[in-house]
């Protein structure tokens, strides 16, 4: 019995304990650069939606697919991170994922139609999906456990500030040179990241020819895709009055049942649901789902509203979103301080701030001033910064290093699902209320309306 104890202890030791400080810093810089770039591409289209909508002759909900389908593809492909890392090694998977999303980002800028743009955005999300979970796994393994809070804060800034940099710089470039250059700007930095990762990441041997559980992967993918289609097209097709929506709902339910049944009975399932037996991990997954729902939605909905109805230029919209990045930076430093007291304080405080910022936005109208929007964006940033660090540390506090890659993949899967589904629901609600408001307004229009206005 005593002989097994050292093996357990060894499994809990990070490989990075033996790395020099200089090597850790280089790994940190290159990994954070790659994850920042990928996070930048997630929402880079948010300030570009109005321009792309005109260029592609698309409706509001159609052009939003360029956002939601990218996040959906990321969500579907993220769970494959564990298998890819085991099959090809973390270094190779991380490096070539950065290269792939760099190439697909260039192709997004070169797209000439809505269909091609959505195709390349889907490939961009799917091929780059391993970057975020692998980045966090590599960093946590490269640093001693006592520095986990610091590393998580730095990585969190990359994940949160990346989506802020994209719309901000993208808005400026689109106003000066057109929306395509917001995508093109990623390419040279992406190639630098690819070369840097190749030079700095330590080589790791694949664990062998691990068989992919195709039943689990396909059933999960079909479930997510069908639910996303229901949410994206439901309002346009009048929900369950449409045969398509009914069929997609039935297929989603059936595929989800297959996924759960198979995962609980297979010897090596695609996702190990037994990780959910860890109470902290299960609670963390629930909270990160909510975090994903409230994190990206304002950044998708506000830019079209401000540009189309309030007449804000792209550059000013980018500056408003940039305030969110400033708030996030403040939030991360606050999270480190609060975490020394009790992580639960950070979680409660962060989600409370997020709720207050949403309540604040409920009261704005088209006469809102820039200062109010920037202040609200700043509060949102502080909230997401304060939440991220304690949420990540608490979720993975009991997860063994051997399960870290798979656990991280599920964590980011639920974060992306929360974002994608809630964005689609929000846009469906906007389309519904817009139609209802239009109907009410037309009730007061008749042939005499213009005559009375002229006489007045």
Residue ranges, per PLM feature:
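Flexible interhelical linker loops that connect adjacent transmembrane helices
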Residues: 14-19, 146, 194-221, 236-241, ...
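Hydrophobic transmembrane architecture of multi-pass small-molecule transporters
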Residues: 3, 9, 17, 410, ...
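A membrane-interface helix-boundary motif in multi-pass transporters
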Residues: 175-187, 233-244, 432-456
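Cytosolic juxtamembrane N-terminal segment immediately preceding the first transmembrane helix
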Residues: 1-39
């Amino acid at each position: 019995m005593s002989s097994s104890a050292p093996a357990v202890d060894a499994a809990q030791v990070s490989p990075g304990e033996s790395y020099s400080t200089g090597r850790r810093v280089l790994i940190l810089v290159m990994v954070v650069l790659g994850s920042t770039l990928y996070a930048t591409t997630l929402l880079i289209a948010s300030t570009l939606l109005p321009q792309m909508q005109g260029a592609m002759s698309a409706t509001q909900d159609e052009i939003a697919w360029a956002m939601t389908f990218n996040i959906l593809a990321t969500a579907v492909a993220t769970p494959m991170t564990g298998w890819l890392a085991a099959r090809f090694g973390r270094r190779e998977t991380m490096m070539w994922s950065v290269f792939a999303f760099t190439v697909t980002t260039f192709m997004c800028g070169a797209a000439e139609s809505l269909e091609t743009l959505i195709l390349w955005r889907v490939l961009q999300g799917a091929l780059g999906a391993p970057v975020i979970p692998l980045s966090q796994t590599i960093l946590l393994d490269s640093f001693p456990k006592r520095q986990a809070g610091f590393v998580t804060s730095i990585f969190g800034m990359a994940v949160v500030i990346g989506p802020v940099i994209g719309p901000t710089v993208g808005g400026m470039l689109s106003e000066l040179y057109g929306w395509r250059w917001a995508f093109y700007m990623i390419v040279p930095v992406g190639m630098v990241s690819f070369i840097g990762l190749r030079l700095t990441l330590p080589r790791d041997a694949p664990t062998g020819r691990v068989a992919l559980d195709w039943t689990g992967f396909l059933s999960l993918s079909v479930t997510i895709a069908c639910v996303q289609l229901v949410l994206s097209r439901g309002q346009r097709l009048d929900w369950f009055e449409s045969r398509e929506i009914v069929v997609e709902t039935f297929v989603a339910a059936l595929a989800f049942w297959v996924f759960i049944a198979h995962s609980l009975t297979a010897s090596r399932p695609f996702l190990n649901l037994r990780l959910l037996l860890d109470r902290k991990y299960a609670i963390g997954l629930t909270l990160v789902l909510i975090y994903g729902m409230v994190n990206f939605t304002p950044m998708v909905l506000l830019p079209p509203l401000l540009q189309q109805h309030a007449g804000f230029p792209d550059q000013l919209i980018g500056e408003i979103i940039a305030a969110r990045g400033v708030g996030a930076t403040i939030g991360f430093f606050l999270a480190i301080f609060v975490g020394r007291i009790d992580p639960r304080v950070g979680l409660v405080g962060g989600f409370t701030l997020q709720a207050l910022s949403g309540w604040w936005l409920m009261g704005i109208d088209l006469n809102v001033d820039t200062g109010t929007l920037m202040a609200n964006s700043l509060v949102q940033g502080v909230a997401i910064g304060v939440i991220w660090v304690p949420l990540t540390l608490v979720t993975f506090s009991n997860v063994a290093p051997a399960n870290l890659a798979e656990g991280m993949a599920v964590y980011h899967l639920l974060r992306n699902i929360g974002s994608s589904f809630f964005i689609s629901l929000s846009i469906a609600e906007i389309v519904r209320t817009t139609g209802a408001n239009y109907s009410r307004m037309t009730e007061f229009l008749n042939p005499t309306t213009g005559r009375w206005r002229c006489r007045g």
